[in-house]
């Protein structure tokens, strides 16, 4: 088959800038073949190379005594004691989910699960952080339905409980939804599998499902802005099969017990290209692939298509040669393909052969570790506009503006479509704070949360970055967990615009400072840039996935308020309304600075709560919606009313950081007050749970009326009642 001629248009269609193409010519000393152009395009795009963010990502704290493996592998690995480790990562599937919501979201789940079990871990939990456009936008309901169905269909069939996440709506996501998928698994800490190849002449083995044309060019598409040609990109979205993935999991874990695996890597973005290059580059080796041996489900596939296909449920492995028969038998038992498609070589070459023709012969290291890296110009985000004087609003009317919005209404419609209990170890389902999953057969548990407030990050990227980490820290400590480590999913617009690059730089600086101050290192992550449509960028959305350890489930804080319990706030309340949920929902404005995060107070208050968790019935962090929304959510979940003493809007709805709302008995409250005074921790009694009404100062409404609004607003705003 004749390959296309290399033209300026073809180079541009592959997402390569003229100076990058010039660099390719200098590296190889000739014009690339069509297949080579595709390989460079895939490896040098933002999705695979992190060329715009790498400089700043290096500044993040990634180590600690608990960290076994930080960024650079398929997922991060953290010690949880007793010879066990938790393996986790968060990754975006934004562009595919906008083009084809069901399959885009489903394969996002599949990809992150493979990242985890590639390391030798059995997945035990998933989460999803979702951002959509305005509820009234013509595409939003379609996207919400498709994405939620896709996540549920894949995760439920695979058999991993979905224990948390976020769902938000904002006009900036109208043309570019975000789907950030998180997965965590358990492994023996001395049996972690890595991706660096070793040994010359070792067989390179293809495992799993067959290769088709789905997803060809997916990584390049994920590194571009959208425009009005978006519907034409549908073929670049992959198609997932969770049953095959489940078989692949079991086959891989079985194989890993046999001392057969030298290295292993899942085939994700850029498929066979990226997995082979990363394995070779990390091991300082070259790779030769013979594509005639690649299992194919379509006819007449070209080398270009096979190298760039993103067909799902596939892995690449470097195998001990003497173990071939044993390994093949395992994969055939699970009805999966097992094919030797190449070998490791000593030279720094990526050699691709198809039909006895050399289709690509490139210096392998130049594709990965020596890929372009940019120090892009950036401008700091200017100070946010000052808060205008707000119109008067009654406290209950203010609460209704929040719970009547899909951003803060009950999200049961979403998580009731997910299997939250499969595996029988889920201790705390989605809905109130962090999800909690027992470490099977033990009294230990792991807590999981995902957090970010994009309004804050836009107004003040540095403080917004700090706050995302601090909120994850609080959500973990609020359930009694010791925060261990984080994964970050940095979703931003076009980094070639200095103001967008400034958002990214500011957020990374804030994230780094918070992670360092809280001993909460980043061990894995993902960067998704060019989240723009027709030149309009999303709110900067650096999602933080946090993982914590509950050493003994007796220390879990996960009850509900009881009749007569006191409501107390740990931490200082100043009444900060800038960029608050109330101002956005009740008045439709986004103004003022983001709340500033005192990391010393965050740590002190979090450690105080963990130390005295036995005294409280329940704890929740105070963030979006402040005290009023948190108190209502706890009361509503318990089927109780709540009375807060203050009627002052700033006291009720302010979003000061480093705060928790706790419920406890009169007797325990006295002990908590005494302990707080001794520790120098601010603690204030703010009200009481009980009765059948929600009252703020003298303003009240029946709990039943508010509960009906809270539990119906999500579906009504999106016309999902009949979905």
From Swiss-Prot:
Q: Which residues bind Mg(2+) 1?
A: 91, 526
An example GO CC term for this entry is:
cytoplasm
Database matches in InterPro entries: PRibForGlyAmidine_synth_PurL, PurL_linker, PurM-like_C_dom, PurM-like_C_sf, PurM-like_N, PurM-like_N_sf
User: Single Gene Ontology BP term?
Assistant: 'de novo' IMP biosynthetic process
Q: Which residues bind ATP?
A: 50, 89, 488, 525
Enzyme Commission number(s) of this protein:
6.3.5.3
Positions annotated to bind Mg(2+) 2: 115, 266
What NCBIfam families does this protein's entry cite?
Answer: FGAM_synth_II (TIGR01736), PRK01213.1 (NF002290)
Name under which the protein is recorded: Phosphoribosylformylglycinamidine synthase subunit PurL
- Species of the source: Paracoccus denitrificans (strain Pd 1222)
Specify the taxonomic lineage.
Bacteria, Pseudomonadati, Pseudomonadota, Alphaproteobacteria, Rhodobacterales
């Amino acid at each position: 088959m004749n390959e296309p001629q290399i033209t300026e248009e073809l180079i541009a269609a592959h997402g390569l800038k003229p100076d990058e193409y010039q660099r390719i010519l200098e590296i190889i000393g000739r014009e690339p073949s069509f297949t080579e152009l595709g390989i460079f395009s895939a490896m040098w795009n933002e999705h695979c190379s992190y060329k715009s963010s790498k400089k700043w990502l290096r500044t993040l704290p990634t180590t600690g005594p608990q960290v076994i493996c930080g960024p650079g592998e398929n997922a991060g690995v953290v010690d949880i004691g007793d010879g066990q480790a938790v393996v986790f990562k968060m990754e975006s599937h934004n562009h595919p989910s906008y083009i084809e919501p069901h399959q885009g979201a489903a394969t996002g789940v599949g990809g992150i699960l493979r990242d985890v079990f590639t390391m030798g871990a059995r997945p035990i939990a998933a989460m999803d952080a979702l951002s959509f456009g305005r509820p009234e936008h013509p595409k939003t309901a379609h996207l919400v339905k498709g994405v939620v169905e896709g996540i549920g269909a894949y995760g439920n069939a695979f058999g991993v409980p979905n224990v948390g996440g976020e769902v938000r709506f904002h006009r900036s996501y109208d043309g570019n939804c975000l789907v950030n998928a998180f997965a965590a698994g358990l492994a023996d800490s001395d049996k972690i599998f890595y991706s660096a190849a070793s040994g010359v002449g070792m067989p390179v083995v293809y495992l799993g499902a067959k290769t088709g044309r789905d997803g060809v060019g997916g990584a390049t598409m994920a590194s571009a802005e959208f425009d009005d040609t978006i519907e034409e990109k549908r073929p670049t979205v992959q198609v997932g099969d969770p049953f095959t993935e489940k078989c692949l999991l079991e086959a891989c874990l079985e194989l890993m017990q046999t001392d057969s695996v030298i290295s292993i890597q899942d085939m994700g973005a850029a498929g066979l290209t990226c997995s082979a290059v990363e394995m070779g580059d990390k091991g300082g080796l070259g790779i030769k692939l013979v594509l005639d041996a690649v299992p194919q489900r379509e006819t007449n596939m070209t080398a270009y298509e096979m190298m760039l296909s993103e067909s799902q449920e596939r892995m690449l492995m470097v195998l001990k040669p003497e173990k071939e028969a044993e390994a093949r038998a395992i994969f055939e038992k699970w009805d999966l393909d097992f094919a030797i498609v190449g070998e490791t070589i000593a030279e720094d070459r990526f050699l691709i052969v198809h039909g006895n023709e050399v289709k690509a012969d490139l210096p392998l290291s130049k594709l990965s570790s020596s890929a372009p890296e940019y120090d892009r110009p950036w401008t700091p985000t200017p100070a946010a506009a000052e808060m205008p004087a707000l119109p008067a609003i009654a406290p209950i009317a203010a609460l209704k503006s929040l719970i009547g919005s899909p951003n803060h209404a009950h999200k049961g419609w979403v998580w009731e479509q997910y299997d939250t209990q499969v595996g029988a170890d889920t201790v705390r389902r989605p809905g109130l704070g962090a999800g909690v999953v027992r470490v099977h057969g033990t009294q230990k548990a792991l807590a999981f949360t995902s957090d970010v407030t994009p309004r804050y990050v836009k107004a003040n990227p540095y403080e917004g970055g700090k706050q995302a980490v601090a909120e994850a820290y609080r959500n973990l400590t609020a359930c009694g967990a010791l925060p261990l480590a984080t994964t970050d999913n940095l979703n931003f617009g076009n980094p070639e615009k200095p103001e967008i690059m400034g958002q990214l730089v500011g957020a990374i600086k804030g994230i780094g400072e918070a992670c360092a101050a809280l001993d909460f290192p980043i061990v894995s992550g993902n960067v998704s840039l060019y989240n723009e449509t027709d030149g309009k960028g999303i709110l900067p959305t650096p999602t933080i996935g946090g993982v914590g350890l509950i050493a003994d489930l007796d220390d879990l804080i996960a009850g509900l308020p009881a009749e007569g319990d006191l409501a107390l706030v740990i931490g200082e309340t100043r009444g900060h309304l800038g960029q608050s949920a109330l101002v956005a929902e009740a008045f439709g404005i986004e103004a003022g600075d983001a709340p500033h995060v005192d990391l010393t107070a965050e740590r002190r208050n979090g450690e105080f709560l963990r130390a005295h968790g036995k005294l409280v019935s329940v704890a929740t962090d105070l963030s979006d919606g402040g005290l009023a929304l948190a108190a209502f959510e706890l009361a509503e979940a318990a089927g109780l009313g709540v009375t807060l003493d203050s009627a002052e809007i700033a006291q009720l709805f302010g979003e000061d950081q480093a705060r928790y709302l706790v419920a406890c008995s009169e007797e325990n409250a006295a002990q908590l007050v005494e302990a707080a005074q001794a520790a120098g921790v601010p603690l204030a009694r703010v009200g009481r749970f009980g009765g059948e009404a929600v009252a703020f100062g003298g303003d009240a409404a029946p709990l039943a009326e508010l509960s009906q609004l809270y539990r119906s607003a999500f579906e009504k705003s999106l016309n999902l009642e009949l979905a």
